[in-house]
Amino acid sequence: MAETKKTVRAAAAQIAPDLTSADGTTARVLETIREAARQGVELIVFPETFVPYYPYFSFVQPPVQQGPAHLLLMERAPTVPGPMTDAVSASAREAGMVVVLGVNERDHGSLYNTQLVFDADGALALKRRKITPTYHERMVWGQGDGSGLRTVATRVGRVGALACWEHYNPLARYALMAEHEEIHCAQFPGSLVGPIFADQMGVTIRHHALESGCFVVNATGWLHDDQVRAVTSDEKLQAALRGGCHSAIVSPEGKYLAEPLTEGEGLVIADLDLALIAKRKRMMDSVGHYARPELLSLAIRRDPATTTLALPCAGYPVTSESAAAGTEPEPEIPGPLRRGLHSPLGH
């Protein structure tokens, strides 16, 4: 891996998906990477679940009516890895750019809100799933696990990512801070709730930058008026699919490095001087000299979740020690089962 750069040109992409085609949205991603490369961008962040699109229908349609839209999203959702990730990987490699992309990942019969980090050589450095879908999203996505609550070393530095209201889970943010995150990649859907969502987002990302002493690159999506009408014909509900955009780049001192984009499509671009991280942490390092781990600490389960667990068979091998003692060996109880058991398993 190349030596970490001292200055990084970053971009937050606020663009509209293709609500009719996963390939169309992927083409928009590749086109935007090429455009960013022409402007010297070295890291780009796309909105939450941008491929094929955020499930806006789940916010404005009653659950009993969501079946057709939900099934269509499942049909269009990519697998990871798959043709979509191959295309983005090749584009990242060609541009020499770190790409952070949100997707609806299909894993057999379930969908997940998944964040992908491609390094500048095209390698998929991180795949993580949103640990708790928010409100209406629970009708669409499954829950992620703790295996992705980590940062990854990339050509531009240590990168971490969270999606939307995961930023209101302080322990999730602290997990990334504890791994000395340098560039935090935040993703929100955009075109949702209204201006209050954008205002809250600004407070949220600036607070994380200040508390963690890292840069934050935040990307939100955008819907055109015809797309809003395609999601719902109810004019009152259409108002819930406008506003809520706040693509921005924030320094470790909590300052905007470029004017946030709250309307329309475009790229927010800024140069990140990584020396500012040490300047900020010299005064307050929340996971270093300003921490009190003997008083307050975080426990994380990073083992991947699984729906099955292999158990030992009923007959346990007799060892020389147990034979000499005339006893049967105690079974090895797997950790996930051992937690919460009040007594050993019977023979």
Residue ranges and their predicted role:
Residues 121, 127-128, 260:
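Short hydrophobic alpha-helix segments
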Residues 77-98, 158, 164-268, 346:
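CN hydrolase (nitrilase-like) catalytic-core segments centered on the catalytic cysteine
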Residues 22, 34-120, 190-212:
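Cys-nucleophile CN-hydrolase/nitrilase-fold catalytic domain and related Cys-dependent amidase chemistry
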Residues 101-103, 114-117, 150, 247-249, ...:
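Short beta-strand scaffold segments in enzyme catalytic cores
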Residues 1-43:
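N-terminal glycine-/serine-/threonine-rich phosphate-binding loop
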Residues 7-19, 114, 127, 151, ...:
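Active-site-proximal beta-strand elements of phosphoester/diester hydrolases
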Residues 134-152, 167-171:
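Active-site glycine-rich loop that binds ribose-phosphate moieties when present
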Residues 220-347:
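C-terminal beta-strand edge segments of enzyme domains
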